[in-house]
From Swiss-Prot:
Keywords carried by this UniProt record: Cytoplasm, Protein biosynthesis
Protein name per its UniProtKB record: Ribosome-recycling factor
Species name: Vibrio vulnificus (strain YJ016)
Gene: frr
Family: Belongs to the RRF family.
GO MF annotation list: ribosomal large subunit binding
Task of the protein: Responsible for the release of ribosomes from messenger RNA at the termination of protein biosynthesis. May increase the efficiency of translation by recycling ribosomes from one round of translation to another.
Length: 185
């Protein structure tokens, strides 16, 4: 029973860390990366379809993304979807290939992005602490039902705290790497 609680807490904490990594991958740095456009949807025959399903996105070089649209008639719609996104990008089409040059980030914008990234990381830490709280309350319920002893409860809480510390450390490492990437010129 205790192992189930610990396993569940660990899985949920890992999912929180992965969700943070995924969220931070969408924050624009000075470098071109295909995941930058992963949040963009295109109107494809009346349905909002992710860009990655209607086109191939590759990083042509450090500052340019190249998008090859599978259906030529969608080129205009893809271009418009990129322009309408809040990424501040200006796509240029050349036949079926759309090139998206990434303008260099200003110092002020970098600092704003660092603040945003820190906020996301704090949200991840809060999620991990909430998972710890849930696991500890599950343990308290078992203790109240006399299904586990106080020693087992204390030992399990210590182990859950170790899981929490490890997850928070991972979040801090991800944050530090992203901040470093953002502040590179």
């Amino acid at each position: 029973m205790i192992n189930d609680i610990k396993k569940d807490a660990q899985e949920r904490m890992e999912k929180s860390v992965e969700a943070l990594k995924n969220s931070l991958s969408k924050v624009r740095t000075g470098r071109a990366h295909p995941s930058l456009l992963s949040g963009i949807s295109v109107d494809y025959y009346g349905a909002a379809t992710p860009l990655t399903q209607v086109a191939n996105v590759i990083a042509e070089d450090a500052r340019t993304l190249a998008i090859t649209v599978f259906d030529k008639e969608l080129t205009q719609k893809v271009e418009k979807a990129i322009m309408m996104s809040d990424l501040g990008l200006n796509p240029m089409s050349a036949g079926t290939v759309i090139r998206v040059p990434l303008p260099p980030l200003t110092e002020e914008r970098r600092k704003d992005l660092v603040k945003i990234v820190r906020g996301e990381a704090e949200g991840g830490r809060v999620a991990v602490r909430n998972i710890r709280r849930d696991a500890n309350s599950d343990l308290k319920a078992l203790l109240k039902e006399k299904e586990i002893s106080e020693d087992e409860d204390r030992k399990a809480q210590d182990e859950i705290q170790k899981l929490t510390d490890a997850a928070v450390k991972k979040i801090d490492d991800v944050l530090a790497a992203k901040e470093k990437e953002l502040m590179e010129v």
